[in-house]
Regions:
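A conserved FAD-binding loop/helix module that cradles the flavin
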Residues: 229-279
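C-terminal auxiliary extensions adjacent to catalytic cores
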Residues: 281-338
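FAD-binding core/adjacent interface of flavoenzyme oxidoreductases
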Residues: 17-99, 185
Length: 338
């Protein structure tokens, strides 16, 4: 429903406006003495004050035996390129049995978008969503789950409330059944970046950076972190994009305050977050605490909010493409909004 360009934010002009130097590279590690961030090209950056917002990885370790049949949704650019190549392949070369592992928002949107892409191209695709024992969207209200389940049922997408491990030709479910699959999309949970294990930073039990209410490292006061890469030690905060966005102004203040010796601010997560989940064909489901709704008007609301967010950062036009088959599961561009 959107072009890839409309879903990207170009960081270069943002960095120029802020007077910052932009470096495109992957982090491979960091040290505190000397205080350096190490990059995958072998170079290092010295720091006095460090802010981490590098996100998380898809936890697909149990699915690794699938080999080339396993496609994690992250990194999104890699996934998108593979998906586009797949859509352009001749009918005899495309999968007929798709499984998506993950019962959260990303898994739901991915399986519905994939189903729509095949359906609108006149192709047959058998889709299943493997959710784990808690089922679809376990942290949302029963009404939201019912809306999503109705959308899945309408498109004949089977839900399997089981844990699964990968095999060379499909998935082995925790009830002993084997589910064959030509392609498996991994959207199951977040895993901390592996390089964090070798740093001096205090981590939680799952390997994420432990931070206090100011989003400051509990072990290194000159290191801050927001988003999926960190875990609050004072309360449980869901790994949701909305918190990375809303913590931004607090982080900006705290970085300046730390440098000038001023008091730090606390990030107070809202009790409820607004989720707008695309279910295909310009339909969407709204979830806000105990409240829910579904329909075209929800998609229009989502579209309006997403366009506004992208426009704030000088993105190219985010007008929807002309009505055409979906080009990729939109999981990375959807989810929490406020």
């Amino acid at each position: 429903q959107y072009t890839p360009e409309a879903c990207r934010i170009d960081l270069r002009p943002l960095a120029r406006r802020a007077g910052a130097r932009f470096i495109e590279a992957r982090v491979s590690g960091l040290t505190s003495s000397p205080a350096e961030v190490h990059l995958s090209d072998g170079s290092a950056l010295s720091y006095d004050l460090l802010s981490l917002d590098v996100g998380s990885e898809v936890d697909d370790r149990a699915l690794q035996p699938l080999g080339p049949r396993l496609w994690p949704l992250k990194p999104l650019d890699v996934f998108h390129e593979r998906w586009q190549t797949l859509l352009q392949s001749p009918p005899e070369a495309v999968p007929r049995r798709l499984a998506v592992v993950g019962g959260g928002a990303a898994g739901v949107e991915a399986v519905l978008a994939a189903s729509a892409a095949w359906r609108q191209r006149g192709r047959t695709l058998s889709c299943v969503l493997v959710t784990g024992p808690r089922g679809v969207l376990p942290d949302h209200s029963p009404a939201v789950r019912a809306h999503v389940q109705a959308a899945l049922s309408m498109h004949r997408i089977e839900c399997l409330p089981h844990r699964a491990v990968g095999t060379p030709d499909g998935l082995l479910l925790d009830d002993g059944r084997h589910h064959p699959a030509d392609l498996v999309l991994a959207a199951a949970g977040a895993r901390a970046p592996s390089w964090l294990r070798d740093t001096p930073l205090a981590l939680d039990a799952r390997g994420f950076v432990a931070v206090n209410a100011h989003h400051q490292s509990t072990s290194h006061p000159n290191v801050f972190a927001v988003g999926d890469v960190c875990s609050r030690v004072d309360q449980t905060v869901a790994r949701s994009g909305v918190h990375a966005v809303r913590a931004g102004p607090v982080l900006a203040h705290n970085l300046g305050a730390w440098l000038s010796g001023q008091p730090l601010h606390t990030y107070h997560p809202r009790r409820w977050s607004l989720y707008l989940l695309s279910t295909g064909s310009r339909q969407a489901v709204l979830s806000w605490g105990p409240f829910s709704a579904a329909g075209t008007w929800v998609w229009r609301l989502k579209d309006h909010i997403d366009r506004g967010f992208m426009a704030r950062f000088g993105s190219p036009s985010v007008s929807p493409s002309p009505p055409s088959p979906p080009s990729a599961p939109p999981s990375a561009a959807s989810g929490p909004h406020a």
